[in-house]
Amino acid sequence: MQIYVDDIIFGSSDESLCESFAKCMSLEFEMSLMGELTFFLGLQIKQLSDGIFLNQSKYTLELLKRFNMDNSKAINTPMSTATKLDMDENGESFDQKTYRGMIGSLLYLTATRPDIMFSVGLCARFQSNPKLSHLKSVKRIFRYLKGTPNLGLWYPKSEKFDLIAYADADFGGCRKDRKSTSGTCQFLGHALVSWTSKKQNSVALSTAEAEYIAASACCAQVVWMKNTLEDYGIHFKNVSIKCDNTSAICLTKNPIQHSRTKHIDIRHHFIRDHVLNNNVVLEFIDTKHQLADIFTKALNEDQFEFIRRELGMLNCP
């Protein structure tokens, strides 16, 4: 159950339980039943016999109109692979309030649009002193949304309930401080349920270290999900975390300190404990099938669309 001010979402596989709960709540609060959930705080929910579809198409169209991008030319990716954003200290400044409004609005949209998570996060790093070069990248995101307003997440009905995760990192991608970006995502069966794109807190000295830190962050999320699911009587062992760097995988299995790892912050090493206790297992995956890649860098159109499909993103049925 989720409560937001005076809005309550509840559900059950047994309709009589829903009715019983609603009756109990009505005894304590003045309330009315709105029926099957179809809309909540900008989130559109379409419940079908073979699954559930989530999207924010109405919100997307409102954003395009609010920021005068509704007549813009559509484009196929939210960010070009040639884009290299930096502070652009000599560039022409742009209104900070407007820029922050655009970023904040786009961040809310990432609740159902993981395909723009990286590009929005990258542009968000320049909110303190936005330039026209940064605005250009933000407008490209809107142009991408112009061509894909109905995209959303599809959660198919399935008996498969495996917990699988993907972890990836670029290396020194931030041109300001050379820190890397971690990207992670987690699936329950075929359903994408969690994703992140976040700049790392320290500068990595190698690709392996950057990937190791990303895997550690992914492990933390997996452990939380695993513990939450155990409250519902669902237990997992050896949850698979997919990584495309063999050196990083080896680091999770080798507790010995040496020149390559002695400087890494101790909090990143907790993944070793969970590997040792068979809570998670890191498995190698080829880079072209690394789904977390979309959360670490701009991709070419073919790879971007492939990963987007694999994440379960479809047009509204």
Give the residues covered by each predicted segment.
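Catalytic palm subdomain of template-directed nucleic-acid polymerases
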Residues: 1-30, 44-55, 91, 125-131, ...
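Two-metal-ion RNase H-like nuclease active-site motif
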Residues: 105, 163-175
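C-terminal reverse transcriptase regions that engage the nucleic-acid substrate
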Residues: 33-151, 286, 294
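Active-site palm subdomain of RNA-directed nucleic acid polymerases
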Residues: 1-5, 9, 18, 28-35, ...
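Acidic, metal-ligating active-site segments
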Residues: 174-190
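Mobile genetic element proteins and their domesticated derivatives, centered on retroelements
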Residues: 6-8, 21, 25, 42, ...
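Structured nucleic-acid-interacting core domains from mobile-element enzymes and related host factors
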Residues: 144-167, 234
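RNase H-like nuclease module associated with reverse transcription
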Residues: 39, 162, 180, 191-192, ...
